[in-house]
Amino acid sequence: MNLLLLSNSTQHGRGYLEHALDTVTGFLPAGARLAFVPYALADHDTYTARVRGALADAGIDVRGVHEGGDPLARLDEADAVFVGGGNSFRLLSALYRTGLREALVKAVRGGLPYMGASAGTNMAAPSLRTTNDMPIVEPPSFETLGLVPFQINPHYLDPDPGSTHKGETREERLREFLEENDVPVLGLREGSWLRVEGDRAVLGGERDARLFRRGTAPRELAVGSDLSELLDVRGEFDTGTRS
């Protein structure tokens, strides 16, 4: 498969996709017809226009899958697909409702380049269980696209040792996930991304990532790390830690 999985689409102080623009335009075929999936936000037209503006100078023809009335037809005519960020629960619900969930799996496994950002990157994992988002809607299932066999946590945020906030840190939430599921989780800090080409996966971007596994301490991963071994994991959900 051919995947570009961004932690975020907007970096502080920079424009939409600006921090990853060279990587994005290098990933997409020249002059590509890009099917954009805007369902993670409520205003699909404005969202699509924003993506179109960001990629116009690169000669990318951005087409919202909601435009024209048939999302599946938009996907069929595309040279690549971009699933944008927003609320992951809203996005997954729409993928099920439109039939795009099954169509995306088939198309991407058949060679269609897939780019995700934030919620779109969450969709590439097997399950929605490591999203940061509020469940504003209830999808039919937490099962996402399963393009990679491990979980991803976009926008991964390190604990602040000076914070007086008493809610759970991101690390604590991911440890709770691992108490119930034996599936590795890749924490992608903002500014980082994962590039998958066939059987090879490499960490890219400006910041290191963090890998969580059951029974071991979190491991820091430097930009440029080869993470291909993660493509071979066989995780198990709902295993718990009880004997």
Swiss-Prot record:
The active site is at residues 118, 133, 155. It catalyses: Dipeptidase E catalyzes the hydrolysis of dipeptides Asp-|-Xaa. It does not act on peptides with N-terminal Glu, Asn or Gln, nor does it cleave isoaspartyl peptides. It is found in: Cytoplasm. InterPro entries: Class_I_gatase-like (IPR029062), Peptidase_S51 (IPR005320), Peptidase_S51_dipeptidase-E (IPR023172). Keywords: Cytoplasm, Dipeptidase, Hydrolase, Protease, Serine protease. GO terms for cellular component: cytoplasm. One of its GO terms (biological process) is proteolysis. It comes from the Bacteria. Its EC number is 3.4.13.21. GO terms for molecular function: dipeptidase activity; serine-type peptidase activity. Belongs to the peptidase S51 family. Hydrolyzes dipeptides containing N-terminal aspartate residues. May play a role in allowing the cell to use peptide aspartate to spare carbon otherwise required for the synthesis of the aspartate family of amino acids. This is Peptidase E. It comes from Streptomyces coelicolor (strain ATCC BAA-471 / A3(2) / M145). The gene is pepE.
